[in-house]
Amino acid sequence: MVFAHRMDNSKPHLIIPTLLVPLQNRSCTETATPLPSQYLMELSEEHSWMSNQTDLHYVLKPGEVATASIFFGILWLFSIFGNSLVCLVIHRSRRTQSTTNYFVVSMACADLLISVASTPFVLLQFTTGRWTLGSATCKVVRYFQYLTPGVQIYVLLSICIDRFYTIVYPLSFKVSREKAKKMIAASWVFDAGFVTPVLFFYGSNWDSHCNYFLPSSWEGTAYTVIHFLVGFVIPSVLIILFYQKVIKYIWRIGTDGRTVRRTMNIVPRTKVKTIKMFLILNLLFLLSWLPFHVAQLWHPHEQDYKKSSLVFTAITWISFSSSASKPTLYSIYNANFRRGMKETFCMSSMKCYRSNAYTITTSSRMAKKNYVGISEIPSMAKTITKDSIYDSFDREAKEKKLAWPINSNPPNTFV
């Protein structure tokens, strides 16, 4: 190695190390003619850099943008309107206020959260082909995308535990409203802390990109595996085991262990219908969020930005369909929910039976707790004597109303 000296009048000598060159190439580097191979290498590097930049800024066709916007828009409207309606009906209707419905409201709030804080931004990134909202927004969007499914799966596990003890061991353990609130709060607090590392793994390294998947480093891989086990596999296995025991108990209720027909079952049919509804709900949820967890385990390299964007958008649409399908499932399997909607929007012929049917007395309060209804009795079906109480007080006996108790034990389930 030799050293070349550069003289300057205003500065001290600067010693620059240079490599030995062959004797036939002793000319100055500024005047030396580069080889053709060097030009080819520089051109290839420039081409690869430009191709990477074009992958990061793709342009979708108008048809692709319209299709994605329509599908996401329909699901978004169903999710916002349906889950808001679930919260409103359970809040206003007395017939739907129960312990199980606390869990239902918690899931509806989680669906509203992902509908507002995550899904619109994913659609915006897909349609524009870049991320323009900064690194902090990228972290928050991905955080809520991990938070909501974890909260919901643990709330579904809480519902499963509630159904198990209500049907199999009704006298040994009961999930009261206070216990339900504590279980819901524990689900939110635990998962909020569990998905905190997402804030460190995600972020916008440059202004126009927000990573879709966790990094392929050993830290990212380790967290992905732990999140898949704790946030999906273990709760799913527990849910399956609990519902398996519940189904066995429903079909095998004899003291001697013999199998009986469902018509001889001591379990009320309303609770059997509730189990069916929650089984379908759990199945839809697990199938909807399974592709999301599998894609995170796969750790695809985001070299082709358009391809990874298409994959992630499809996965987001599948998982988001679970949020939009829950209110539809409630309205199909839940007669009380349908009646609650009628009471909420005053669509019933008996507009607000609780406010117009009774005076404020002790007996009226007891009647409200026992779900008293009102029936119209036609005048042709009654025989009233001349000296009856109606004639004494000059009351017309054309349309008199009779109150009767519908159910002495109001249901404590969602159905």
From Swiss-Prot:
Pfam families: 7tm_1. Keywords: Cell membrane, Disulfide bond, G-protein coupled receptor, Glycoprotein, Membrane, Receptor, Transducer, Transmembrane, Transmembrane helix. Abundant expression in the brain. The keyword Iron does not apply. GO terms for molecular function: G protein-coupled receptor activity. It is found in: Cell membrane. The chain crosses the membrane at residues 70-90, 103-123, 144-161, 183-203, 222-242, 278-298, 310-325. Belongs to the G-protein coupled receptor 1 family. This is Probable G-protein coupled receptor 19. It comes from Homo sapiens. The lineage of its organism: Eukaryota, Metazoa, Chordata, Craniata, Vertebrata. The gene is GPR19.
